[in-house]
């Protein structure tokens, strides 16, 4: 994990989960020139009521063909010398910390990058959720666990012989330009997933909380019959 002194206070994560949402956080970042913070719109919550707020543990996936040996020490074997077709995936999973989000990109979306057993391990470790640039599987099992997962949807084909993790706790970038560094804040809800740069997370959360209060005031003005044009002229909120 990134240096704990650099991370957003965990109490602020609770505020994000209970008081904020991706739309307002995205608006606040747009206003500050952070305009590529949403992940691709294909990445959606497994269930509409799932919410994620946690620190990024970025994971880099790569396509492969067949059960090939790893390209880095420890990639090709698991404990006891057993062949490990997943590269560094199991190691990355075991190193998840409390409030971290397993967030993965790099491969092509033709196999599942997440499943029930991974969710079980992550939940046991206190992780905040998983976000994958591809599919998940074992949907019913994940629902029973209640572990937040965001993906392209459900597709049972395994990543074994098709993809492997080649690095983790490293910077990653999604196809739409969104960059994720270790310790960035990942927020996901029914409207999508975004990344808040670690160095500006406290500033962004504070501004978003203020904007939520302003939006509530605007809602009351609209209910009283004021025009949206007039309201926007007074508040700059819409």
Mark where each language-model region is:
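Intrinsically disordered, low-complexity regions enriched in acidic/Ser/Thr/Pro/Gln residues
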Residues: 1-92, 101, 220-226, 233-237
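Extracellular/luminal Protease-associated
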Residues: 91-119, 123-133
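A short secondary-structure junction signal
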Residues: 113-117, 133-134, 142-144, 161-162, ...
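Ligand/cofactor pocket segment of small-molecule handling proteins
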Residues: 120-124, 128-157
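Acidic, glycine-rich flexible loop/linker segments
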Residues: 154-231
């Amino acid at each position: 994990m990134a240096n704990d002194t650099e991370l957003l206070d965990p109490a602020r994560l609770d505020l994000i989960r209970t008081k904020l949402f991706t739309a307002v956080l995205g608006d606040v970042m747009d206003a500050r020139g952070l305009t590529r913070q949403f992940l691709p719109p294909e990445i959606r919550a497994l269930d509409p009521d799932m919410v994620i707020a946690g620190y990024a543990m970025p994971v880099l996936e790569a396509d492969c063909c067949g059960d090939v040996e790893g390209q880095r020490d420890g990639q090709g074997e698991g404990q006891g010398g057993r062949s490990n077709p997943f590269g560094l995936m199991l190691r990355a999973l075991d190193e998840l910390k409390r409030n971290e989000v397993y967030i993965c990109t790099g491969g092509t979306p033709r196999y599942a990058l997440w499943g029930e057993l991974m969710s079980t391990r992550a939940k046991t470790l206190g992780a905040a959720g998983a976000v994958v640039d591809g599919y998940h599987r074992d949907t019913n099992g994940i629902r029973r666990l209640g572990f937040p997962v965001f993906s392209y949807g459900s597709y049972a084909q395994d990543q074994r012989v098709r993809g492997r993790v080649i690095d983790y706790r490293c910077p990653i970038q999604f196809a739409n330009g969104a960059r994720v560094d270790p310790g960035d804040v990942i927020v996901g809800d029914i409207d999508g997933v975004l990344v808040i740069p670690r160095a500006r997370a406290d500033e962004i959360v504070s501004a978003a909380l203020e904007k939520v209060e302003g939006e509530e005031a605007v809602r009351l003005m609209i209910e009283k019959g004021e025009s949206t044009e007039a309201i926007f002229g007074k508040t700059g909120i819409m």
